[in-house]
Amino acid sequence: MTQSVVVQVGQCGNQIGCCFWDLALREHAAVNQKGIYDDAISSFFRNVDTRAVGDGGSISKGRISSLKARAVLIDMEEGVVNEILQGPLRDVFDSKQLITDISGSGNNWAVGHKVFGCLYREQILEKLRKSAEQCDCLQCFFIIHSMGGGTGSGLGTFLLKVLEDEFPEVYRFVTAVYPSSEDDVITSPYNSMLAMKELNEHADCVLPIDNQSLFDIISKIDLVVNSGKLGSAVKPKSLITSNMGAVKKHHKKPFDAMNNIVANLLLSLTSSARFEGSLNMDLNEISMNLVPFPKLHYLVSSLTPLYTLADVNIPPRRLDQMFSDAFSKDHQLIQADPRHSLYLACALIVRGNVQISDLRRNIERLKPALQFVSWNQEGWKTSLCSVPPVGHSHSLLALANNTCVKPTFMELRERFTRLYKKKAHLHHYLQVDGMEESTFTEAVSSLSALIQEYSDLDATKSLPVPDVPRLSVAL
């Protein structure tokens, strides 16, 4: 069994990470009721004997003693990390695997990347190495950060290059939260643009998340929960926005519900690596099957169902609806419509009581409405994990390498250009050692080249699919 390490950077990264670890513990507790440390739990947790001197000895088998997350927490302010260390999950994190500063990055990519990157490189590397040494078979680093702030975008993408240099064989999956057009950080277009160049060059897979899409999904769920319509009662533990197993009209913090959606995405993404199933998918297979070209590694994700109705049995029609929803624009985690764009490849990660025949039937049903590139007409990768998320009988995560991601990048470029034309706030960046104006122009060129690659693919959309010649055998 393989292990993964989560590196959560900045306020957003640490808040999502906290939700992820909370949900992961609940999920494993629901499955592993005997309290035995098994391969599934070891994928994200170490079992530590706290009675041992020093770091505590790792226990590979037997009963669970004290679980420690395979995580590195990084933030250049202390607030969020201190909050985590005083909260209910405080014992899950190893205090020696935290890096914090006091001053923060001031919503400036250059400070996070150039200043704190250089200042903390060796400390970060030491903690990454320690996490790697504690794994029997390290397969993947999951990096979680925002694109709009200074620490997440700057230091988050700095450590991506560190990981590439030091652990070239270990996959780098990035969950990057993109700011909405209403973002209150005025410099977020600069930060996002500069971070994009690093993601293009140093990530294996990027799962872009759009704050606006998360907000829209929450609004949609709230409409159902509060509608009071007959037959629309929602199972309390099935809300994709809830981590407390209870429906609450008001979350403790405005971003809690949004963060839980992203945490559920990560749980589903790793489900096959953690639990048994009739059709398992390794994490390396995602990159292998869904990324045909190195730079086109942005995967659009969707999650279904968003909730489960309490008073309805699940007939096949409802199961089929789950598959249909995964391709609708209302369920995408960025503002995108994959059905009207071009697929390079698509993965369906199914959990729970679903048969392979259900999977095949739905792919055949949906295929005519979806356009794939001519050279990858059968570009499907599927996974069936027998363990559903808590509160659901089944769920589906769809990952699409699809040209529908292009408008997100085009909007980012437009927002950047509006700011950059005025040279607004540019001096805050250029006064940082190592920053030059060419850093901005190179970042724009990098993103424009990426957009052009998607445009070139889109241009092939209306072309007929060539018949593949078959070999004739001479007898």
Swiss-Prot record:
* SMART domains linked: Tubulin (SM00864), Tubulin_C (SM00865)
Q: What is this protein called?
A: Tubulin epsilon chain
Instruction: List, in alphabetical order, the GO biological process terms annotated in this UniProt record.
Output: microtubule-based process
The entry sums up its family as follows: Belongs to the tubulin family.
Say which species the protein is native to. Answer: Mus musculus (Mouse)
Cellular location of this protein? Cytoplasm, Cytoskeleton, Microtubule organizing center, Centrosome
The encoding gene is: Tube1
Read off the CDD domains from this record.
epsilon_tubulin
**Pfam families linked:** Tubulin, Tubulin_C
UniProt keyword list: Cytoplasm, Cytoskeleton, GTP-binding, Microtubule, Nucleotide-binding
Sites binding GTP sit at G148, G149, G150, T151, G152, S153, G154
**GO cellular component terms, A-Z:** centrosome; cytoplasm; microtubule
Leader sequence residues: none
Quaternary data: Found in a complex with TEDC1, TEDC2, TUBE1 and TUBD1.
InterPro entries found in the cross-reference section: Epsilon_tubulin (IPR004057), Tub_FtsZ_C (IPR008280), Tubulin (IPR000217), Tubulin/FtsZ_2-layer-sand-dom (IPR018316), Tubulin/FtsZ_GTPase_sf (IPR036525), Tubulin_C (IPR023123), Tubulin_CS (IPR017975), Tubulin_FtsZ_GTPase (IPR003008)
**Which GO terms label this protein's molecular function in UniProt?**
GTP binding
